[in-house]
Amino acid sequence: MALMKKSLSAALLSSPLLIICLIALLADPFSVGARRLLEDPKPEIPKLPELPKFEVPKLPEFPKPELPKLPEFPKPELPKIPEIPKPELPKVPEIPKPEETKLPDIPKLELPKFPEIPKPELPKMPEIPKPELPKVPEIQKPELPKMPEIPKPELPKFPEIPKPDLPKFPENSKPEVPKLMETEKPEAPKVPEIPKPELPKLPEVPKLEAPKVPEIQKPELPKMPELPKMPEIQKPELPKLPEVPKLEAPKVPEIQKPELPKMPELPKMPEIQKPELPKMPEIQKPELPKVPEVPKPELPTVPEVPKSEAPKFPEIPKPELPKIPEVPKPELPKVPEITKPAVPEIPKPELPTMPQLPKLPEFPKVPGTP
């Protein structure tokens, strides 16, 4: 019994709801928490029973159907497609050249003729004969001496190495391709031909003729009046100047040069003979011993192995492109060149040249004067 009382007291004290209720009853003013608990008790949400999990039923494993192995068919050889000739392009029609428009002839203006001025003739220079060069005698080339022919050494012959025969492989016969059953193609239904409606014929429209334009007459140019001829301009004659007599230089007396005294001749120095050097005896050079020539060993020649020739591929001819005809360019009409009138040159009058006065002769300087 004692144990039961202890367990009940312990259970009451351990529950938080009973403790809150006791505190609310003992206290004079009710607390907000106690009021809420007493007035608005929360409804308990009923727990739904746990539904068993839906297990997906396992499907039985079906054995995979094995595909039957198809026999390997050898690849059929494709038939050779015949070469399709290229269609020739139609020739472009030649475009006619446009006719050149003829320009009216422009009459040239006639210029007045001026008198011709004669050109002064140059004096002829005498011809200078070319000096003849002496002939050089031909020098004969010396003939080179003929060298004796050196016989070539014979190489040792090697035996030929026979090529090993390659084993022959049997030819693989190609398997015959089984003939497939020919399936008849279904015939297409015939479509009835629909007759084309005939178009109504249009009346021919007469071409309008262009009205003829009256020819316009060219106005005649008025004739230029003839210019009077220019009178010849006479060259003015130069006035003759009086001759100026040449001044004769006064004769200066000749001054004799003083004779220099002769220097006495110096006596000749006697010749000093050079002492002769004693002759040194000639030292003979020692002769070196001759080294015997060692013959070079001849190398054996390796037989040439023929190279395998690469297979030649047939050349594929390039297709020729059709030539496009050249379209000629229309030529433009040439405009006539208008020549400019040449202006005559007026000769300049020559000025009279002044005569040169003769230079005065220079007098010789007298020694002793500044």
UniProtKB/Swiss-Prot annotation:
Cellular component terms (Gene Ontology): extracellular region; plant-type cell wall
Q: Where is this region: Disordered?
A: 65-370
Which top-level group of life is the source organism from?
Eukaryota
GO process annotations (BP)? positive regulation of seed germination; post-embryonic development; regulation of photoperiodism, flowering
Please list the residue ranges that the record marks as compositionally biased, kind Basic and acidic residues: 65-223, 232-262, 271-296, 306-334
**52 X 5 AA tandem repeat of P-[DEGQ]-[AEFLIV]-[QPT]-K: where is this region?**
43-365
Instruction: Name the chain's protein.
Output: Protein PELPK1
Q: Which organism is it from?
A: Arabidopsis thaliana
